[in-house]
Amino acid sequence: MKFKYKNLILAAARLLAVCALLSGCDGSGAETTAPEMLETVPETTPETQAPAPSEYNIVSGKEGFFKIVRPEELDSTHIAVTTAVEIRKFIKERTGVSLGLGDDWIMPGTEHDPEAFEILVGPTDYKESLEVMSSISYGDYAIRAVGNKIVIFSYTDVGYEEALQKFSTIIRGGIDNSGGNMSLTLAAEKLNVVGTVEKMTASLPLYHDGKLTAVANAGDGAYCIVISDTTEAAYNSYLSALAADGYKTHCTNELAENLFATLYTSEYTVNAGFYKNSDEVRIVIEPFSEDTLPLAKTEIKSVTTPLLTMIGLDNLVSGEYQNNGLCLIYRLEDGSFVIVDGGHSEDATVSATDIINTIREQSKDYAKSDSEIRIAAWIITHPHSDHFGTFVKAYSQFTKFKVERVFANFWDEATFEGFKSAKDTFAPGKYTTYSQTPTIAAKLGAKYIVPHVGQVWWIGGTKFEFLYTLESFLPRTTPTFNTCSLIFRTVTTDKSGKDYTVMVTGDGTGYTMQIIADTFGKALKCDVVQLAHHGSITSGNSGGTQKAYELMKPSVLLWPVGDQHYSTVKEYTYNHVLYDSRNPNFAELYIAGWQGNTVTISLPYTLGTADRKVVVEP
């Protein structure tokens, strides 16, 4: 069984801080002890072929009797590997003896020697490691004596940090320097520790019949467990295991042979998905609240006809064109509105005014005052200032309306902090306001919603189906926030039962577009596409963007870009597949253009009936 894990940029720095703590002293020169941890000691030791000795002689005099082993497949930056290195370093500092350090590779057809004395760190392919791994939960770490092996393992990065602290404390207690002979002997009874470092993932049953790829922090208090090389049957068995643990099924969804389910208890909500194309399962667990459960389809009172409006955002600020940005407004059948992004921070007041004028005009037949206008959802695709800047800077202008929900799903704080200085794009402080999104939602009196892949939210008679969130990309990390941009589609059904589909791609990169193309295939077919990232660069994977567009084959293109920049991005060949002979459905293309421009189409839309308002650039 092979395992791979998320390589956090900050892991090395955090581990060094832990190591400083381990070898540090207090002001009096006395040794400091590791912090108290939540831990449990099993009543019995698992049965093994080689009974564990009562004690383990690690070092005697100048001789070491153990070798430290780490997984061969993990690179030197992985926290399991750095933990192995730090254990070796710590033992040498305390005893003067440097233990051997190697990996778990052996010739095919051979087996590891059960009689060899070894410290196994991380997900090695030793049976002793597998025994320990199968006996603990995803939120745990373990230090266990199994036969002649000492096994140290965790499913999470923080678990390795805790295990390193605990094992170092055990080592301190096993050092004897009396009689002039340095020795390190560890009692077996001390090597039977399980600690819980993450309560939610520790509560989950283990997944069988698959390979664990990652237990990754997904931000917003959620964790994502990724299982590869699995099957639909194993996925269904896991749902049954969740049910046996008390989880209730809230809803399920199927798209292109991919299966999704939302389950919950009074403590946690789980969103699980089986991905047919990649034979993967992704399990996202988060604290339970009613807001984690997607809205089901219900009967609504028909108040008006659905519309979709794109608002232009280009403007001159300090002599520079703003060019990009995204602002879409849905008017739904029940008379409520959904705003997607909103526009720049630099001219947020103007963008907010344009949004407000649009929703007032479109609701004048049924809303007598601003207090009667409902913004059922404000969806933030990602936290770049040309998309959610208006939301951050001008949200106070919307307190006069009833804002019910804010949707967002961003990187967690730790990952963001690690990337701020990774590239010029992430200059310190440039995008730190993204973390204000839940706070602003609260100020608007709105519920804060974190959507997940496969979820369907029914809002005002329209189906909002999420196809990509950052959890689709985990455990990989990326130095561009565009890779965490939401991708979703909306489906509006007319009275005859015909569906009309709009694809909203936000600032999706070529990598995210590749993921949805590989995952959903021909199911990406739609009627309208909002071009990804303004039709601009794909962050190094133009083929992924083109592949997705070839599957979408829309009739109508909404291009969220200013006229100045359009002359550049229209030359990018991956966009051509949307409107050249490779797309026989193409009929209409609309450029967002100058600030205040609008193009409005009905949903469903009849070609040639768009309502356009064009503001002349001053």
List each model region and its residues:
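Bacterial signal peptide processing site
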Residues: D26-S28
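A cross-family detector of function-defining hotspots
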Residues: T213-Y275
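Binuclear metal-ion centers of metallo-dependent hydrolases, dominated by the metallo-beta-lactamase
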Residues: R405, E413-E465, R476-T480, I515, ...
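Compositionally biased P/S/T/G-rich terminal and signal peptide-adjacent segments
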Residues: A50-R70, K190-V226, R282-L293
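C-terminal motif of bacterial Sec signal peptides marking the signal peptidase cleavage site
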Residues: L21-G24
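Active-site metal-binding motif and surrounding structural segment of the metallo-beta-lactamase
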Residues: G335, T349-A408, F520-S536, K553-L557
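Solvent-exposed alpha-helical segments and adjacent loops
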Residues: A50-V194
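Core dinuclear metal-dependent hydrolase active-site scaffold
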Residues: D291-I373, A442-K443, K447-K525, V599-P618
